[in-house]
Amino acid sequence: MTKIYIYCLFDRFDRFLGVYSSLKAIHRDAVKYCNVGASPVYLLSDEGAEKASLVALRNLFKGKCDYEIQYRSDSRGVKVLKTKLTE
């Protein structure tokens, strides 16, 4: 049985925006959605906040399943959920 992970994107009102199989694609779309105001985009997780980058996102998700990370700027925010696809 293979492990297939998917990443779901939700806005801050929990409206579904999309499903992805690639971290690169979901990071691109999350930053594009949040990058509207004057402040930079940050990743918020249980470990704290840090500037949004693909490397940081990959390291936060490494070894975890059913885990949520938030992208935030001064005016917008989205949630990224990593979960396992069940067969």
Regions found by a protein language model. Give the residues of each.
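Short aromatic-glycine-(Arg/Gly/Cys) micro-motifs in beta-strand/loop hairpins
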Residues: 1-16, 25, 31-33
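Generic low-polarity alpha-helical segments
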Residues: 26-27, 80
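Short, mixed-charge low-complexity intrinsically disordered segments
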Residues: 35-87
